[in-house]
């Protein structure tokens, strides 16, 4: 099918710059200011590019080179916000002023960067289906055909049922994920496309296909495309119609590629190195490297490329290049065209013909599409789905059985109130657990909104709608189980009203916490807001504090609380028509009073009337709780109003507030904090181990040339190198041996693998692979998805699942010491996973000390090599710098056996890529064995590799040997192939030959005419399709020679008699590991000021809120009840605090799982211990703040005997919730599941502590849980400390009136009862009405609640036991989850039990698996 017919761009599109001087915010670009120290504040910088003049027409693809490219692209993308240019110049889209056009038609400007952000639990086809549904209002069948065609074009048909995945969720490979991003961008259907390093992670063949498709799409849809590429072969460069070259301050060229080369090479006489590809040549001009001699070009001893003519032109700086550009005929040509275009443009407003609807589908379809995707997300994330379902079912069973068969008595009415309150509170906690998922959705939603797939508020509305639907199912399950176990009224009306209000209240909480997530910039701040909201909801639901007892300054909160209205409606619905038996509450009672008329007794329950041994439910509601049944449907309307209000505010926040929380805005805010709050500055200006030079690069105080260690450091590949020890080009010989002592003393070993097969399920990813590495630099190459990363993981012993067969040998001997092997190798992952709040130097130092020899001086060498600003935070690094840091983290370990690198040059510009490969070459020349996957290598880059190991799709080896011989090998076996050593890139040649082609686009040259369609199926190198290169290699003489060479090398290695384990660096002691990781975690925590502020603010705010709510607690019966609920609310604060702790600890956990664990950086228990040690002082100090804010407001005793012991126990409680939160985080597969576990286990343990249900009413089966719940002991200790020896003076309404029999005083009449049950009389000697108070002192109340002051130290010991249990469970949970990896087995077991979850069609494709 032809795809072009579905695209409707603006006709005659063009982008014209006429002498425009553009000012751009530097933070918008990918380029970071390396000279800026992270310890110093600077305002957001601005890039100013002067005199930009060019015109790009419809159907053209323009290559843009230069440091400011990313900033320019983002400026054009956010044209109406961030693009500023001088009035003397002009920027036009057609005849429209660009900023006006960008404001009126933002959907016509499409931006794609190097980041691949997707929902990991959606499959590839679901992701593309969604994008197509948002942009094309066509029948479903056409959309499916269009999807399949796109997947076919981009070579993704074989993974369409596979999860997309991310760095932490296994899914498609990185290259395949990049292609998904490209497809999404194409689907956006714009007129101007800005491709910002969009080929990062693609091999050269796939990148060429991408450019071919872009070129065809540009011509078919008549769009304008601007492309930034860091590395590209000449064949790729030839695909571009024009090239725009930007210096830091000026434009230096625009025109065709042929004109560009003529201008610089022929006219300006800037010579080109024969091994450099075009993009390397042009990049060197922009970076002004053509003025440098061989001594300043890292590792090269080639002659100077500066000609006499060039020197005569006196090109000394960028201004000279710009001057020569404007003097050229090319500039005059384009200046005439752009001036004419601007002169003809007299329109002040945007042409109405160019304005089209921003969104391609109606709102109804947007809502439907987003809702369907929400359903697919939740079904895909099975861990989260199952954890929610299990928690609701188990919780309803447990609580239903706890309140089993509630009696129709006055005491039973309290249980009914507790059950109602618990139901409301449980679903509040469950809604709170959704906040982490809300934050994880936001980056993907932000990308889609920028692509104009839908309105931001539509996604919010759809997500809320689906969450409400899914929660409704949970509420129905919960209600059915709980309602009938508790034996609430068996009446259809009562049941459905209970279900209705619990459901609507739950919807309200879903919207409220969704709103909280949308208005908070970070999850820590969201947890702060949610913590305060949670307290307000719980305390002012009119159950913890009755309406009549609320202080007047806070009673208004109850009327703003949906829980209060839900509580009144549900409890009124249950009690209004009941008659509650009062036999357990009659005063006086006992054998002495059995024969006395009831006219002398009274029912001690609110709402009781004299002479009746029962209480009507409606009377209890009215007098005790201030409830009335007549408010039920009024409250329903009010809750619906709250729901609509929260939902409306969520939609507004999604549209206008959340978009403000971009990285750029948050960096600005962080800069303001640094400027006005110097104490927040996290960097040290003085460092004992390193100093900073003018370039912001860490250099040791000792000169590099003087480094001398037992294993000598590799000299820096910077200008500070000794000129008498240089890397020669591979074609040259190294004839200087005077500096051999400087080289790393690496004993040569032979690492070989034979008949390696790797299978996951029924899919074979590596098929009978054999090879070896002894020394030198070997490139592991193949098309995207061929299994390169998988083979690296197998060889480095990093596979986590599947079956590996075959042999891995060291010097011909089977590998037995895997731990030593892992410590002898380095592995640079494709994903750049680091702790964001460490500096570059700190990141390198940790790796050096834990995995290397601890040579801190060597850190300066690596920093100089990689040109990294040592004192800059990782969070402030550009993507390129993060990649360099990943390499540096492995280099500082000095791997003695083998260094693996997975695409180390991906995303780097040509110069940086060449620098890295040159350094790798230097290491290999010193004996280091290096195996490196590489994408898109230029001819000069690939020439540094000694050998290549070539894979085809399916993980089959098709060649192993030197690269020149590889080209000869393929040509010799297929005479129809041709290879020109002078012109062709050998890397591109071998990939083209063995690659089956990711798409069906022909690999034609730029000169070949291109069709206006993008669907002509022509395969790669048709002439080679009939050859099975894998089978040919297995029987080839070349493989026999490889085997013979391996035997000789192994024999030499065995003769040396050196065991590779002798060169393994001894790891630091266990205590040293703990010390170093604890210091690291402390630094990361200290620098996260948002987290620290949120923790202290939540404790202070919650303490004051609770303290003022229970202000000066009275010495009456209500005061006793208030004391219990005060302590219960103090424990409730732990829930949002746990969420904060988990969010913070997640960062280091993910880094450990993704990188450090696989590299044996330190023992897994070290991370858990270090995180606990670092969090402990924060928990204690913040809990101290809470205690000070709360305790002294409530009016309890302030002596050390009471307040001191209370404080001691609360500090222990802070240790409990800290260890509890870390246990669940380290035992759960992800943060969302951990949040559900917190909600479930918190409500589970809290329900058995005797607050919700009195111990006397516990079913016998559950009495053990009363003893097992840690909250039982905390509550008993806290309440007994507050109420011990506290005098009770009942208020008039709390006095129980009774009438003595004739001839007796009240004291005489009530004495038997008081002797048995306690209490006191207001007046003993009266003969009329006896005013009885149930308690004399607080200990009487404690005894009734099964509590005792004398248990406080016993409880203190039990509390320590629970803390120790949490810590032990944390270790066990982490071991089972991440060492033994039990979760996949658990999920598989559940899938077998639930047939609907058996999704065989959605299998994973771990060709190049993520963690």
Curated annotation (Swiss-Prot):
Q: What does this protein do?
A: Transporter involved in the uptake of sterol.
Record topological domains on the Cytoplasmic side = 2-388, 440-471, 516-524, 658-1090, 1139-1175, 1226-1230, 1377-1411
Instruction: Name the GO terms of the biological process aspect.
Output: sterol import
Q: Which residues are exposed on the Extracellular face of the membrane?
A: 410-418, 493-494, 546-636, 1112-1117, 1197-1204, 1252-1355
Q: What is this protein called?
A: ATP-dependent permease PDR11
Q: Which residues bind ATP?
A: 782-789
Location comes to: Membrane
Gene Ontology terms, MF aspect: ABC-type transporter activity; ATP binding; ATP hydrolysis activity; ATPase-coupled transmembrane transporter activity
GO annotations of cellular component type: cell periphery; plasma membrane
Q: Which organism is it from?
A: Saccharomyces cerevisiae (strain ATCC 204508 / S288c) (Baker's yeast)
User: Which classification does the entry list for the species?
Assistant: Eukaryota, Fungi, Dikarya, Ascomycota, Saccharomycotina
Q: Please list the residue ranges annotated as the ABC transporter domain.
A: 31-273, 751-979
User: What family does the entry list?
Assistant: Belongs to the ABC transporter superfamily. ABCG family. PDR (TC 3.A.1.205) subfamily.
Q: How does it sit in the membrane?
A: Multi-pass membrane protein
What are the TM regions of this chain, as residue ranges?
Answer: 389-409, 419-439, 472-492, 495-515, 525-545, 637-657, 1091-1111, 1118-1138, 1176-1196, 1205-1225, 1231-1251, 1356-1376
SMART domains, sorted: AAA
Task: Tell me which residues are glycosylated.
Answer: 595, 1289, 1324, 1346
Question: Taking the first listed entry, what is the main subcellular location of this protein, grouped into a coarse class?
Answer: membrane
InterPro entries given in the database record: AAA+_ATPase, ABC2_TM, ABC_transporter-like_ATP-bd, ABC_transporter-like_CS, ABCG_dom, ABCG_PDR_1, ABCG_PDR_2, P-loop_NTPase
**Keyword Nucleotide-binding assigned:** yes
Q: Which UniProt keywords apply?
A: ATP-binding, Glycoprotein, Membrane, Nucleotide-binding, Repeat, Transmembrane, Transmembrane helix, Transport
């Amino acid at each position: 099918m032809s795809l072009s017919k579905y695209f409707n761009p603006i006709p005659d599109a063009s982008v014209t710059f006429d002498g425009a001087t553009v000012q751009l915010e530097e933070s918008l670009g990918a380029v970071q200011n390396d000279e800026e120290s992270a310890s110093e504040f600077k305002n957001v910088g601005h890039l100013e590019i002067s005199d930009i003049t060019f015109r790009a027409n419809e159907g053209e693809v323009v290559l843009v080179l230069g440091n400011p490219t990313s900033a320019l692209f983002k400026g054009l993308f956010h044209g109406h916000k961030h693009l500023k240019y001088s009035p003397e110049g002009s920027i036009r889209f057609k005849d429209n002023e660009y900023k006006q056009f960008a404001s009126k038609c933002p959907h016509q400007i499409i931006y794609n960067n190097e980041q691949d952000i997707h929902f990991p639990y959606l499959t590839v086809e679901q992701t593309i289906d969604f994008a197509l549904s948002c942009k094309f209002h066509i029948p479903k069948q056409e959309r499916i055909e269009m999807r399949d065609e796109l997947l076919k074009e981009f070579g993704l048909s074989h993974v369409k049922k596979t999860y997309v995945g991310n760095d932490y969720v296994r899914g498609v490979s990185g290259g395949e994920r990049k292609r998904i991003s490209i497809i999404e961008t194409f689907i956006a259907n714009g007129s101007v496309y800005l491709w910002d390093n969009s080929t990062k992670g693609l091999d050269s063949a796939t990148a060429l296909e991408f450019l071919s498709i872009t070129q065809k799409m540009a011509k078919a849809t008549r769009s304008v495309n601007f492309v930034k590429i860091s590395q590209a072969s000449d064949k790729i460069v030839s695909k571009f119609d024009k090239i725009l070259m930007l210096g830091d301050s000026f434009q230096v060229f625009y025109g065709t590629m042929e004109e560009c080369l003529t201008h610089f090479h022929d006219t300006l006489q800037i010579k080109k190195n024969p091994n450099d590809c075009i993009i390397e040549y042009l990049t060197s001009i922009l970076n002004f490297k053509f003025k440098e001699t061989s001594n300043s070009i890292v590792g090269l001893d080639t002659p100077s490329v500066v000609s006499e003519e060039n020197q005569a032109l006196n090109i000394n700086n960028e201004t000279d290049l710009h001057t020569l550009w404007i003097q050229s005929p090319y500039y005059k040509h384009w200046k005439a065209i752009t001036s004419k275009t601007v002169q003809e443009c007299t329109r002040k407003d945007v042409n109405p013909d160019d304005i089209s609807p921003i969104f391609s589908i109606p709102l109804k379809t947007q809502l439907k599409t987003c809702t369907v995707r929400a359903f697919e997300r939740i079904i895909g994330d099975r861990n989260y789905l199952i954890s929610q379902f299990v928690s609701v079912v188990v919780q309803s069973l447990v609580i239903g059985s706890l309140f089993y068969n509630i009696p129709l008595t006055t005491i039973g009415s309290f249980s009914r109130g507790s059950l109602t309150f618990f139901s409301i509170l449980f679903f509040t906690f469950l809604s709170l657990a959704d906040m982490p998922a809300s934050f994880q959705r936001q980056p993907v939603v932000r990308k889609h909104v920028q692509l104009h797939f839908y309105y931001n508020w539509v996604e919010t509305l759809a997500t809320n709608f689906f969450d409400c639907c899914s929660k409704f199912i949970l509420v129905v399950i919960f209600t059915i189980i709980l309602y009938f176990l508790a034996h609430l009224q068996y009446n259809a009306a009562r049941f459905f009203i209970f279900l209705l209000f619990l459901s609507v209240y739950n919807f309200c909480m879903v919207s409220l916490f969704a709103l909280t997530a949308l208005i908070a910039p970070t999850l820590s701040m969201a947890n702060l807001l949610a913590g305060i909201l949670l307290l307000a909801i719980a305390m002012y639901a009119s159950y913890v504090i009755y309406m009549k007892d609320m202080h007047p300054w806070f009673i208004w909160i109850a009327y703003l609380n949906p829980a209060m209205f839900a509580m009144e409606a549900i409890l009124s619905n249950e009690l209004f028509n009941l008659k509650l038996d009062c036999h357990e509450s009659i005063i006086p009672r006992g054998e002495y009073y059995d024969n006395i008329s009831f006219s002398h007794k009274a029912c001690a329950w609110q709402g009781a009337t004299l002479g009746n041994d029962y209480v009507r439910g409606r009377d209890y509601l009215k007098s005790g709780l201030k409830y009335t049944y007549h408010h039920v449907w009024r409250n329903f309307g009010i809750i619906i109003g709250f729901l609509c209000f929260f939902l409306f505010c969520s939609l507004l926040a999604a549209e206008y507030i959340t978009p403000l929380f971009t990285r750029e805005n948050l960096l600005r805010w962080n800069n303001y904090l640094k400027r006005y709050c110097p104490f927040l500055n996290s960097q040290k200006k003085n460092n004992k181990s390193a100093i900073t030079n003018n370039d912001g690069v860490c250099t040791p105080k000792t000169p590099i040339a003087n480094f001398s260690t037992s294993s000598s450091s590799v000299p820096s590949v910077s200008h500070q190198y000794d000129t008498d020890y240089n890397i020669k080009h591979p074609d040259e010989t190294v004839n200087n041996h005077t500096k051999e002592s400087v080289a790393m003393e690496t004993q040569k070993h032979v690492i070989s693998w034979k008949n390696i097969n790797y299978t996951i399920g029924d899919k074979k990813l590596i098929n009978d692979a054999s090879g070896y590495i002894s020394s030198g630099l070997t490139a592991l190459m193949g098309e995207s998805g061929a299994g390169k990363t998988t083979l690296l993981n197998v060889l480095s012993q990093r596979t986590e699942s599947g079956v590996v067969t075959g042999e891995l040998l060291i010097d011909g001997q089977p590998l037995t010491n895997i731990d030593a092997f892992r410590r002898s190798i380095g592995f640079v992952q494709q994903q750049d996973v680091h702790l964001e709040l460490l500096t570059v130097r700190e990141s390198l130092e940790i790796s050096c000390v834990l995995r290397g020899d601890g040579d801190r001086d060597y850190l300066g060498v690596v920093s100089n090599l990689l040109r990294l600003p040592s004192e800059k935070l990782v969070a402030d690094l550009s993507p390129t710098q993060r990649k360099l840091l990943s390499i540096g983290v492995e280099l500082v370990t000095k791997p003695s056996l083998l260094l693996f690198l997975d695409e180390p040059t991906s995303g780097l510009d040509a110069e940086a890529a060449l620098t890295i490969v040159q350094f790798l070459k230097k290491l290999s020349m010193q004996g280091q064995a290096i195996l490196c996957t590489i994408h898109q290598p230029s001819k000069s880059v690939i020439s540094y590799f000694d050998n290549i190991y070539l894979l085809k799709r399916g993980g089959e080896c098709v060649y192993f040997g030197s690269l020149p011989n590889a080209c000869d090998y393929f040509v010799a076996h297929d005479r129809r192939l041709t290879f020109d050593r002078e012109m062709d890139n050998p890397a591109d040649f071998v990939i083209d030959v063995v690659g089956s082609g990711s798409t069906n686009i022909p690999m034609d040259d730029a000169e070949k005419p291109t069709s206006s369609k993008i669907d002509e199926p022509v395969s790669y190198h048709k002439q080679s399709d009939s050859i099975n290169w894998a089978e040919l290699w297995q029987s080839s003489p070349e493989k026999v020679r490889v085997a013979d060479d391996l035997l000789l090398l192994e024999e030499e290695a065995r003769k040396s008699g050196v065991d590779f384990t002798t060169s393994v660096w001894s790891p630091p002691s266990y205590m040293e590991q703990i010390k170093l990781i604890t210091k690291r975690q402390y630094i990361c925590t200290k620098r996260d000021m948002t987290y620290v502020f949120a923790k202290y603010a939540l404790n202070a705010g919650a303490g004051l809120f609770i303290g003022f709510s229970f202000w000066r607690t009275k010495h009456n019966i209500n005061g006793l009840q208030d004391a219990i609920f005060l302590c219960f609310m103090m424990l409730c604060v732990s829930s949002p605090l746990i969420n904060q702790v988990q969010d913070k600890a997640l960062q280091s956990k993910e880094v450990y799982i993704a990188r450090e664990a696989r590299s044996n950086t330190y023992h897994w228990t070290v991370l858990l211990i270090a995180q606990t040690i670092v969090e402990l002082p924060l928990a204690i100090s913040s809990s101290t703040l809470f205690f000070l804010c709360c305790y002294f407001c409530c009016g309890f005793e302030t002596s050390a005997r009471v307040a001191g012991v209370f404080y001691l126990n609360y500090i222990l409680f802070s240790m409990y919730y800290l260890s509890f939160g870390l246990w669940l985080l380290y035992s759960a597969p992800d943060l969302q599941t951990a949040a559900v576990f917190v909600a479930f286990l918190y409500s589970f343990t809290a329900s058995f502590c005797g607050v919700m249900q009195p111990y006397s009413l516990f079913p016998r089966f559950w009495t053990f849980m009363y003893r097992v719940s840690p909250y039982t002991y905390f509550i008993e200790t806290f309440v007994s400390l507050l109420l011990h020896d506290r005098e009770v003076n009942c208020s008039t309404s709390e006095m129980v009136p009774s009438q003595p029999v004739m001839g007796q005083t009240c004291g005489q009449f009530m004495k038997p009862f008081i002797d048995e049950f306690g209490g006191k009389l207001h007046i003993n000697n009266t003969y009329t009405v006896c005013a009885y108070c149930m308690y004399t002192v607080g200990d009487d109340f404690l005894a009734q609640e099964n509590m005792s002051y004398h248990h406080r130290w016993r409880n203190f010991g039990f509390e320590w036991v629970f803390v120790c249990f949490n810590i032990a469970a944390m270790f066990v949970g982490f071991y089972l989850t991440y060492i033994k990896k039990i979760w996949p087995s658990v999920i598989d077991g559940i899938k077998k039990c639930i047939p609907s979850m058996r999704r065989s069609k959605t299998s994973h494709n771990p060709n190049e698996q993520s963690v």
